[in-house]
Amino acid sequence: MALSVSAASARVQSLVPQQSLRGLKIGMLANQVRAVAGNPSSNRITSHPIMGKTRVMKFGRVQVTFRGTGKAATVVNLSTTSRNERTGSGIGVGSSESALAAKLKGERCVTELGYRHCYLGKWKPGSVVTDFSISKSGRVTRITLGLVID
């Protein structure tokens, strides 16, 4: 018996809005991130205006930000500019805002101070938001899953 798999059904869902990006999740520890993603291409300590010192790991075009720098520091932000990270319905960097609206349920699209974005979730401390940055040409340029801090 021959098995045929279409390209659409073979697509790996590497982005699950409100949940994960490439298997990485908000709240993970650095050792858990490395177990899923391997060694980062970049690993640095930066200063954040609200959180103080943070650790930022990069895995190609995926950036992982931790609240704090020690072993107990947890992931608070996952961001990508890679066209490879897609939802099960194919939404990702490069998708049009109209495609995002058609395939993503519950999103809200707004322009704030000249910044156009569509998001899922509530901007309430402790909540997770999935944010899709939209370019002036109406395409997704960055996708971020983040824990709302304040």
Predicted regions and their residues:
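Peripheral interaction segments used for macromolecular assembly
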Residues: 13, 52-54, 89
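Intrinsic-disorder/low-complexity peptide segments enriched for small residues
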Residues: 1, 19-22, 102
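Secretory targeting and sorting signals
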Residues: 1-9
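Cleaved targeting-peptide boundary
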Residues: 8-16
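Second-shell loop/turn segments in exported
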Residues: 17-24, 84-91
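A small/polar (G/S/T-enriched), proline-flanked helix-loop surface module common
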Residues: 71, 77-85, 97
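A cross-family detector of function-defining hotspots
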Residues: 28-70, 93-142, 147-150
